[in-house]
Structure formats: C-alpha cells, structure tokens
Amino acid sequence: MPRGLELLIAQTILQGFDAQYGRFLEVTSGAQQRFEQADWHAVQQAMKSRIHLYDHHVGLVVEQLRCITDGKSTDADFLLRVKEHYTRLLPDYPRFEIAESFFNSVYCRLFDHRSLTPERLFIFSSQPERRFRTIPRPLAKDFFPDHGWETLLMRILSDLPLRLPWQNKSRDIRYIIAHLTETLGEDALPRCHVQVANELFYRNKAAWLVGKLTTPDGTLPFLLPIHRTDEGELFVDTCLTTTAEASIVFGFARSYFMVYAPLPAALVEWLREILPGKTTAELYMAIGCQKHAKTESYREYLCYLAESDEKFIEAPGIRGMVMLVFTLPGFDRVFKIIKDKFAPQKEMSAAHVRACYQLVKEHDRVGRMADTQEFENFVLDKRQIDPALMALLRQEAPEKITDLGEHIVIRHLYIERRMVPLNIWLEQVEGQQLRDAIEEYGNAIRQLAAANIFPGDMLFKNFGVTRHGRVVFYDYDEICYMTEVNFRDIPPARYPEDELASEPWYSVSPGDVFPEEFRHWLCADPRIGPLFEEMHADLFRADYWRALQTRIKEGHVEDVYAYRRRQRFSVRYGAISSTANSS
C-alpha cells in the first residue's frame, strides 16, 4: 500500500460519519413539522428511516474504502496506522465519541466482526477524560419566578417554537402550578426556578418540554408533554416531577426521542442530573444514538466484568424453546442466543427470529417491548462460565460457538435489559401488587395491539417486570403485525362429544387466532383468573381484536402515554376538550 493512504482512509471514514450524522439531524429536524401537521404515519416512517441511516452510511464508506484500496487486503500494521491517523483527527471534533463508534462499525463490516481487539478498535475511548469542549450555544435557558410562577410559565410556553395556537394556555398554567404546589408546597414554590432545554423532545404524538426544577432541597425533573387536539390546538397533558417518572419517560422499552442534538455528549451530560438511574448507554439510546449506545453498553459490561468474580449462569425462569438466555447474577442485562434447533412446536427459522427482533427495533415499542443490542463474535472467558451453562451452550447452540482454548466465541447474540419474569413475579406477590401486575399485563397487551403488534405467545413467562413495576414483553419469535392475524370465534360444537375430542371440530388455518383460548392459560391460577375476568375479559373476545384491526387499517394511530391515565390533567383537574385525543 502506498504511504499516505492511511490518512486518506481515516479522513474518508470521518467524512462518512459527518454525512451520516448530518442526515440524522436532518431527519430529526423535521419532527416539529410532522407534529404540527399531525402526520403520525410520517412520524413512524421517520423513526424507521433514522435507524437505517447508520448502517446505510457504514455500507457507503466500506464501498469507498474497497475502491481506495483496490480490493487488496491490508495487514495489521497498516490498520493500526489508519486508527492512529483517525485518532489524531478527533481531539477538536465535536462528536468524537460517536465518530469512534462509527470507525468500529466500518472495521467490523470490512472484517466480518473478526479480530476485535482494543488495538484495532475504539473498544475504550481514545479521550476518556474529555466530555465536550466549548458549547457554541447554551443547551438550556433559566427561568426565575421574579414576577410569580404564572408569569414564569407564560414565558416558558410562549418561548416554544411551536407555531400552533394554544387551546387554553392560562388553564394549563393553572394546572401546572396546582401540581407544583401539591408536590413542593406553597411555601417552597417561590424559592424554586426552572431550567428548560432549548430543543423539544418529540416522540409519538407528543412534543416534550424537558427541564430541571431547582428546589431548596435539590434538582428535580420538570417534564411537560405537549399534545395537540384534532383541531390543531396545543395543550399540556400533565407535569412530571419525579426521577421515577422521568426514568419511565426515557425508558428502555420506548422509542427513541427525536431531539435536535448537534452535540449529543453535551445533551447526555445535561440529562444525567434528572435521570440519575440511567447509564450513559441508556441516555444515548434515548436520544436516538443507538449504535453509540451499543458501544457504551459494551464498555459498561466490560467494566462490570473486570470488577466482578461472578460466573455466567443460565437466566432464571422457564427455559425458552427458541432462545438460550444467560446472565451474570448481579448484572442488569441478559444475553440471548438463538438455539441451533427449536422445540418441534416452533416451526420457524433462525432468520425469522432475527427478522422479528429487527421489527421490534424499528417499530414503536410503546413502552412495552424491550430494546436490544445485537452483537457478533462475542468473546467469553471459559473460566467465567458456570459448568452447567457451558454444557447447555454446547448442547443447545454448538454451531454458534467456536472454542479457542481459554475462550469461546459466540457467533451471534442479543443483549437486553434484565427483568423479573412475570410468571415468577406473580408467584411471589399477593394483594394489591398482584392486582397491579395483572392490570399492567392486560394494559401491555392492549397497547401493543393498538400499535399494530400481536405478541403471538402471550404466556406470562414471555413478559418481564421492570424496577418501576411496568410489564414489558421480551420474547419476540412469534411476534407479528395485528393486521396479519385472523381473529376468529370458536364455532359452536356440533355434538357434545366434540368438546371432549383431542382435535378441534373446526378447521384452523395459518394465522388463525381464537381469543377464547387465551382464558385456558391466563386464568388457570385461581388467584389470577377472577382478576383477569374483572379487568380484561374483553381480551377473550374476537370482536375486540377485530375492532382494533379495523382502526389500524383505517389509519388510526393511537396515543401513547408514558404515565398513568390518572396523572393526566384532564383526569385530575377537569376535561380538556371533547376533541382532545383520549387514552
């Protein structure tokens, strides 16, 4: 290879990342117009398009590099020099941390995820002490109640870039003040002030105002979801001021926000104060930088591994028929491998399973489906694998594993947030906790269905409970669109003997689902059955599901709320409008 080619390659990769992030910002910047025009289908399409941008631009750069090198192989020393040149380009680069991840992605695409070492990749950042340099403009603006909270909130809402009229701004301000007074107390409120992010955070059918509420006792989140009526008038739906509420809004089971962030590291640092329970990976994920979030997630895993003497074990819960799941006892994530062979009743391929996981990545997860990170050639130290798990890996997924002596390489796996399996949770709780869990499960099914997702396998074992008590779906191998399912009523038995027969007396075609059958496995436990019948009996009726299908086919996009219905101002303080979207 001619000298100087290393610098050209390094510059080509960085220019490719510039192009990718420029398009990322371009798609993001259209969020306001999509919201104002209530173009909800365009919102969904933009979300998918933005996710695809990264891999598309990695592919473009890889093709450029193959042209530059004329398809010739490059030795290790050459690649190390490329990385050295790339590193020298980053000290004054505003998005250096994501540029490092982009370099990693290009390398992995070129070399098929082989030879992934710290020398060749940015497994750890080249600038670990650096956060960000001078910010060209402030990320947020401060508002003080010098003339009272009514004036302060009027200034905040009037400063928003939204071009739609307000339905009743004064009313919304009264509601916000009422909430703050209830939360903080009338005496404390005059001694508080607010800092509000300059950019709105768009997701689904809401524009979120994200801020920090500084009180005499510390800093709290200040979140206002702004919705629009069918007539195009704005209203504030609620006010959230606890870290738990903010954590759910920015949760791992939700779609990524569309927020204009030319300096994502600066925004992540700003958000950290009101989301103290979120890791760096989770914060990058929330603002849509999912590939860099994967890098940060892997770094968090390596740091945990370095400080722990735990062994990998099979994850608690009922063993899956498609996925082999393992974890570290104290780690908050699980590792999922597609088995080489599935149980006989699972008539599908590994490619189908991967397609299901990709569907979830691109779809609106409505707070009910866990996000995943996908890895190839994942290396584990044999000394850190429990013998029982090692035997299970060799039994269930031998084709996915390469033995390198002291290590094994897993060809493909997913990493996902660890939750308590719902079936285990239900065994351990009683009273109100049991009731809440059943209510959450039914709500999860409803919200997934309204978002055009049918889980397929609705057994409790396929759902998990988060630390906030929310029920989230995490087993995707039978997932499909609601519009692909044929929901049927079970025909009446022809003879009394029909109901005792081992085979159904009616024909069943692929795609047929009989909701009446859900009752057999969801209500078998006498503690659970009556609660389910009380709260979710309509889930056992085919006409309920067909009505949802009709709404979806007619183009209706349901509202998705990241908070309880009882927290909405319309419920707490009075009706907003007969035309406002309802939950």
Curated annotation (Swiss-Prot):
Keywords, ordered alphabetically: ATP-binding, Cytoplasm, Glyoxylate bypass, Hydrolase, Kinase, Nucleotide-binding, Protein phosphatase, Serine/threonine-protein kinase, Transferase, Tricarboxylic acid cycle
Locations listed in the record: Cytoplasm
Catalytic activity: L-seryl-[isocitrate dehydrogenase] + ATP = O-phospho-L-seryl-[isocitrate dehydrogenase] + ADP + H(+)
Catalytic residues (positions): D371
Entry's Gene Ontology cellular component terms: cytoplasm
Binding site for ATP: A315, P316, G317, I318, R319, G320, M321, K336
Alphabetized InterPro entries for the sequence: AceK_kinase, AceK_regulatory, Isocitrate_DH_AceK
EC code(s) of this entry: 2.7.11.5, 3.1.3.-
Chief localization: cytoplasm
Molecular function GO terms recorded: [isocitrate dehydrogenase (NADP+)] kinase activity; AMP binding; ATP binding; phosphoprotein phosphatase activity; protein serine/threonine kinase activity
Pfam families: AceK_kinase, AceK_regulatory
GO biological process terms, semicolon-separated: glucose metabolic process; glyoxylate cycle; tricarboxylic acid cycle
Function: Bifunctional enzyme which can phosphorylate or dephosphorylate isocitrate dehydrogenase (IDH) on a specific serine residue. This is a regulatory mechanism which enables bacteria to bypass the Krebs cycle via the glyoxylate shunt in response to the source of carbon. When bacteria are grown on glucose, IDH is fully active and unphosphorylated, but when grown on acetate or ethanol, the activity of IDH declines drastically concomitant with its phosphorylation.
Record PANTHER family: ISOCITRATE DEHYDROGENASE KINASE_PHOSPHATASE, PTHR39559
Family: Belongs to the AceK family.
Protein name: Isocitrate dehydrogenase kinase/phosphatase
